[in-house]
Amino acid sequence: MENKAYMYVLECGDGSLYTGYTTDVQARLKKHQAGKGAKYTRARLPVTLLYQEEHPSKPAAMSAEALFKKKTRQAKLAYIKERTQNA
């Protein structure tokens, strides 16, 4: 059985959104904040965690990330708002 994985969304210092996946959100966030994450976020510090979503496996989280990245910024924010209000 595979471990749980997460799709996460960061808000960058320039207001842009970054989407990724990981098995440990807090450790990954610390890497991004330390400038050791993705090249995209290194150039746009500071970053804050805007949203995280649990998935049953890494492939499921990767699939969710790919689908999320296809959305417009407005659709991404609406998706996050809808899920965080119902939590």
Swiss-Prot record:
Belongs to the UPF0213 family. Pfam families: GIY-YIG. InterPro entries: GIY-YIG_endonuc, GIY-YIG_endonuc_sf, UPF0213_domain. It comes from the Bacteria. Coiled coil: none annotated. Residues 3-78 form the GIY-YIG domain. This is UPF0213 protein SSA_0709. It comes from Streptococcus sanguinis (strain SK36). Transmembrane segments: none annotated.
